[in-house]
């Protein structure tokens, strides 16, 4: 098998203290979007590290412990479904990454952002890198943190709403999830501005004004 980790650069640039930033849960129908930022020590290397979407759940959990133990600094932020509905998912992702980066101590001097767009009020230079979580270790580490923290949250949520199958789908738009929405309606954790329908049939939903 190809060792993806051997192809990851530690970071995008080496002149400034860099934090990798990524998010998880952007395409989900329910739950927050989670964002993470992390500063890795020089020459950090772990043979398991790669884009979190390419890793097994077991390896992601192993790496989370390594990253949280060895990182110079790391932070994870969650942006709620209500906030996503208010400002849209793209801006919510930007907000989450900005909040996570702002919590880092020591503060980053440069941000390496996974993706092709970013906006922030932070006065920190940044670079957007398409598929950066498969190129740079600090972005991949942020990807792992965001994914594992979100999965952990969604598993707790699944205990509250077992009928939606979130232990399996974790809020993603699977057929099972859409069918459950059609049968049971929406919960306060669903994103009201997303398309939940499996077809053109109407289904009951909670009034947006009733969201706590």
Task: State where each predicted segment sits.
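RNase H-like, Mg2+-dependent phosphodiesterase core
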Residues: 2-212
């Amino acid at each position: 098998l190809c060792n993806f980790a051997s192809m990851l650069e530690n970071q995008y640039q080496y002149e400034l203290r860099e934090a990798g930033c990524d998010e998880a849960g952007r395409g989900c129908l329910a739950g927050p979007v989670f964002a993470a930022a992390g500063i890795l020590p020089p020459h950090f290397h772990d043979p398991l590290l790669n884009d979190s979407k390419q890793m097994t759940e077991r390896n992601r959990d192993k790496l989370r412990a390594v990253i949280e133990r060895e990182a110079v600094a790391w932070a994870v932020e969650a942006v709620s479904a209500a906030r996503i509905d208010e400002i849209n998912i793209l801006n919510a992702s930007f907000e989450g990454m900005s909040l996570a980066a702002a919590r880092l101590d020591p503060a980053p001097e440069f941000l390496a952002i996974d993706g092709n767009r970013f906006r922030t009020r932070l006065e920190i230079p940044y670079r957007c890198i398409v598929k950066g979580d498969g190129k740079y270790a600090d972005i991949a580490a942020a990807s792992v943190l965001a994914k594992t923290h979100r999965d952990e949250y969604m598993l707790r949520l699944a205990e509250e709403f077992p009928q939606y199958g979130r232990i399996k789908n974790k809020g993603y738009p699977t057929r099972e999830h859409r069918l459950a929405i059609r049968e049971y309606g929406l919960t306060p954790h669903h994103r009201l501005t997303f398309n939940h329908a499996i077809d053109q049939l109407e289904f009951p939903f909670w009034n947006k004004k009733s969201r706590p």
